[in-house]
Regions:
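Conserved helix-turn-beta segment immediately C-terminal to the redox Cys motif
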Residues: 54-55, 64, 68-93, 110-114
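Thiol-based oxidoreductase modules, predominantly thioredoxin-like and allied folds used
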Residues: 60, 84-102, 117-128
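N-terminal "domain-start" segment that seeds a small globular fold
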Residues: 13-49, 133
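Thiol-/selenol-based redox modules, centered on thioredoxin-like
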Residues: 133-136, 140-186
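Amphipathic alpha-helical repeat scaffolds
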Residues: 40, 60-64
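Short hydrophobic helices that act as membrane-entry/anchoring signals
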Residues: 1-17
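Short, internal strand/loop/helix patches
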Residues: 104-152
Length: 186
């Protein structure tokens, strides 16, 4: 049933992709991506400085969503393209209460069902009013230089380039293994 639900979502969902305009003075990030320090799923502080020089795919995740099978695609991307892109997952309960679990439950679910080894962060909100600081940066042009697109559902994706500049937004309907994503990763 979950596979059918996922296939129907993929079939009928709109594939929105927003791309950063050509570099101008107004499209340069006002705050550096590398300034962030956020808690991992197991409570350790992760310094984003360690991601310098790497492309980063940021995804808001949920365990009870029609798009949850994208965890498998994200894991495959991590395993096959991990030298080119780092995947950061942000569990959130913003859409339909589809991430009700604790950090421990989320970690166990992801490991058992998808063998997730990419970095997952502590459950947080990806929307205002209690939006986590990274998602504030991702969704406010005054901080990232151009993008105002907030997640509209679970499994929306943001691609950050090797210089810490926000490059792309992909809607939930865009597979992490899609031609669009793989082309940008290189």
């Amino acid at each position: 049933m979950k596979k059918l639900k996922y296939l129907l979502l993929k079939l009928f969902s709109k594939k929105n992709i927003h791309t950063k305009p050509m570099n101008t003075a107004d499209t340069i990030s006002k705050k550096s991506f590398y300034e962030f320090k956020l808690k991992s799923l197991d409570g350790k502080e992760i310094d984003f400085n360690q991601y310098r020089g790497k492309k980063i795919l940021i995804v808001n995740t949920a365990s009870e969503c029609g798009y949850t099978p994208q965890y498998a695609e994200l894991q495959e991307l991590h395993e096959t393209h991990g030298k080119k892109v780092t995947i950061l997952g942000f569990p959130a309960n913003n859409f339909g209460g589809q991430e009700p679990g604790s950090n421990e439950e989320i970690g166990a679910f992801c490991q058992k069902n998808f063998g997730v080894t990419f970095q997952l962060f502590s459950k947080s909100s990806v929307l205002p009013p209690d939006q986590n600081p990274l998602y504030q940066w991702l969704t406010q042009p005054s901080l990232n230089g151009w993008n105002a697109e907030a997640p509209s559902w679970n499994f929306c994706k943001y691609l950050v380039d090797e210089n810490g500049q926000l490059l792309k937004f992909y809607s939930a309907a865009v597979s992490p293994l899609s031609e669009e994503v793989l082309k940008e990763i290189g």
